[in-house]
Amino acid sequence: MSELIFHGRIPDGLLYDADHNMWLQRAGDEVVVGATSFGLFLAGTVIAFTPKPVGAQVACTRGFGTVECAKTVLALHAPVALQLSARNEAAEADPRTLLRDPYGAGWMVRGT
């Protein structure tokens, strides 16, 4: 039986929600939210990323979108309450961006 081993990084300088494998970073009056490399490792192949629309109000731990994987669809839980001010359209167009650079170009949403 083969065994998959996680070989990712968990950068300093971010805040983490270990229960939902999400990270956030303060950027002025906004926060940037994304999935951790470990959370994406657990999800496997990401086929689609679908965030809620800009302007949506999201309570802490409630869903702000979904990722569709090879075998399931997973809800993405907000680590803080926020109103979505931007969604990563590049990651929507090419969900592999989330896996390639989860802490940079693979951010998911911004909010206030």
What are these regions (language model features)?
Residues 1-60, 96, 100, 104-110:
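Acidic, low-complexity mobile loops and tails
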Residues 21, 55, 77-86:
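Generic structural motif
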Residues 40-41, 83, 90-91:
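Short, charged/polar surface micro-motifs in flexible loops or helix N-caps
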Residues 50, 57, 68-69, 74-78:
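Small beta-strand-rich domains/subdomains or short beta-sheet motifs embedded
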Residues 58, 64-65, 84:
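Generic structural signal for buried aliphatic residues
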Residues 63-72, 90-91:
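Short, charged beta-turn/beta-strand-edge "cap" motif at the junction between a beta-strand
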Residues 74, 80, 107-109:
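Generic beta-strand structural signal
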